[in-house]
Amino acid sequence: MIPAKDMAKVMIVMLAICFLTKSDGKSVKKRSVSEIQLMHNLGKHLNSMERVEWLRKKLQDVHNFVALGAPLAPRDAGSQRPRKKEDNVLVESHEKSLGEADKADVNVLTKAKSQ
């Protein structure tokens, strides 16, 4: 068995180590600057990708609106006032026509459904 003097020395050394490390029960590991920068860049990239996807959808909506033959009213740069309710053009009231590419897509879809 270990003598009491040696045990007291070991206890004092262990106590000194515990008080001098100043860990306060918290994890000593911290994130490095490069890790934080990487996470920041990833967040910016994901935000940018969401914005690009939103813009792509909006442009597709505009393209579909023009493809349906809805007249576009010319607007000068200075007038940004809201339109009157009567000036709004409803897309459903216009006759929808299928272009050649759209007809091909419909034919492919009908063949796929029948299988």
UniProtKB/Swiss-Prot annotation:
A molecular-function term among this protein's GO annotations: receptor ligand activity
Superkingdom, taxonomy of origin: Eukaryota
Keywords, ordered alphabetically: Cleavage on pair of basic residues, Disease variant, Hormone, Secreted, Signal
Signal peptide per UniProt: 1-25
Subunit organization: Interacts with PTH1R (via N-terminal extracellular domain).
Compartment(s): Secreted
Effect of residue 54 to A: Strongly reduced affinity for PTH1R
Disease implication from the record: Hypoparathyroidism, familial isolated, 1: A form of hypoparathyroidism, a disorder characterized by hypocalcemia and hyperphosphatemia due to a deficiency of parathyroid hormone. Clinical features include seizures, tetany and cramps. FIH1 inheritance can be autosomal dominant or recessive.
Name of the protein: Parathyroid hormone
Record-linked PANTHER family: PARATHYROID HORMONE (PTHR10541:SF2)
Function: Parathyroid hormone elevates calcium level by dissolving the salts in bone and preventing their renal excretion. Acts by binding to its receptor, PTH1R, activating G protein-coupled receptor signaling. Stimulates [1-14C]-2-deoxy-D-glucose (2DG) transport and glycogen synthesis in osteoblastic cells.
Result of changing residue 55 to A: Strongly reduced affinity for PTH1R
Keyword Nucleus attributed: no
Effect of residue 18 to R: In FIH1; dominant form; leads to inefficient processing of the precursor; the expressed mutant hormone is trapped intracellularly in the endoplasmic reticulum resulting in apoptosis; mutant protein-expressing cells also show marked up-regulation of the endoplasmic reticulum stress-responsive hormones HSPA5 and EIF2AK3 and the proapoptotic transcription factor DDIT3
Effect of residue 58 to A: Reduced affinity for PTH1R
Propeptide: 26-31
Biased amino acid composition, Basic and acidic residues: 84-105
Keyword Zinc belongs to the record: no
Ranges for region Important for receptor binding: 51-69
Family classification: Belongs to the parathyroid hormone family.
Disulfide feature: none
InterPro entries: PTH (IPR003625), PTH/PTH-rel (IPR001415)
SMART domains membership: PTH (SM00087)
Region (Disordered): 73-115
